[in-house]
Amino acid sequence: MGQKINPIGLRVGVIRDWEAKWYAEKDFASLLHEDLKIRKFIDNELKEASVSHVDIERAANRINIAIHTGKPGMVIGKGGSEIEKLRNKLNTLTDKKVHINVIEIKKIDIDARLVAENIARQLENRASFRRVQKQAITRAMKNGAKGIKTQVSGRLGGADIARAEQYSEGTVPLHTLRADIDYAHAEADTTYGKLGVKVWIYRGEVLPTKNTSEGGK
C-alpha cells in the first residue's frame, strides 16, 4: 500500500501534523468548504510567490493562517502592503477576523510542491522533460535530500501514445512511516494536452517524540 497511497496522508498523526486544526460538530461541512475556498483563493492570489502549503487554525470567530512560501518578500510586499491587501480580501471572503503568518521555506529545492510546480512551468515553456527532471534531482540531492523520485506522464514530446517516464536517485522508503517523505503533483498545460508531474522527496528519518507524562522515556 505504501506505493499507492498518498505519502503525506499515510504519515499524518505519526510524524506529520494536520494542515487544518479545528473542531466542529454541526458546522463541520460549511467550515471545511470555507477552508477549501481559502486555500484556493490564496493559491490564485499568490501564483508567483512559490507557496508550498497553507495551515489553518480556528478559534471562535478568528482564523489563523500560516503561509509557507519560498518568496516571503513577495507575499508581504513593501512595508507589509501586499499582506494587508490579502488579509482584507480574506476578511471579506470569510466574514471573520483573519490573522496571517508568513513562514519562509529555506530550501526550496527539497520542497516537493515547489519542485513539481517548477518542473511543470518548464514543461509549459517547451523544455525537455528528461532534462528538467534530471536537473531537479541534482539540485535536490545537493541541498540535502536523501533520495528523490520524479515522474512525468502524458504525451511526452508530442508522442501519439501517452506514457510515463520517471527518474530517481538515492532511496525513497515509502513503507517506512518514520521516513520524512514529501510528495506533490502538478499539471503542465502544453500544446499537446496536459502533462502530469509527480515528485517524492525523502528528507531523512523523523523519530516520533514520546510523551513523558504518559510514561514514555
From Swiss-Prot:
CDD domains: KH-II_30S_S3
MF terms (GO), sorted A to Z: mRNA binding; rRNA binding; structural constituent of ribosome
InterPro entries in the cross-refs: KH_dom (IPR004087), KH_dom-like_a/b (IPR015946), KH_dom_type_2 (IPR004044), KH_sf_prok-type (IPR009019), Ribosomal_S3_C_sf (IPR036419), Ribosomal_uS3_bac-typ (IPR005704), Ribosomal_uS3_C (IPR001351), Ribosomal_uS3_CS (IPR018280)
Stated family: Belongs to the universal ribosomal protein uS3 family.
Annotated signal sequence range: none
Domain of life from the UniProt record: Bacteria
GO cellular component: cytosolic small ribosomal subunit
Entry's Gene Ontology BP terms: translation
Keywords on record: Ribonucleoprotein, Ribosomal protein, RNA-binding, rRNA-binding
Gene this chain is encoded by: rpsC
PROSITE patterns xref list: KH_TYPE_2, RIBOSOMAL_S3
NCBIfam families: rpsC_bact
Pfam families: KH_2 (PF07650), Ribosomal_S3_C (PF00189)
Organism encoding this protein: Staphylococcus epidermidis (strain ATCC 35984 / DSM 28319 / BCRC 17069 / CCUG 31568 / BM 3577 / RP62A)
The keyword Ribosomal protein is annotated on this UniProt entry: yes
Protein name (record): Small ribosomal subunit protein uS3
UniProt function note: Binds the lower part of the 30S subunit head. Binds mRNA in the 70S ribosome, positioning it for translation.
Limits of the KH type-2 domain: 38-106
Assembly and oligomerization: Part of the 30S ribosomal subunit. Forms a tight complex with proteins S10 and S14.
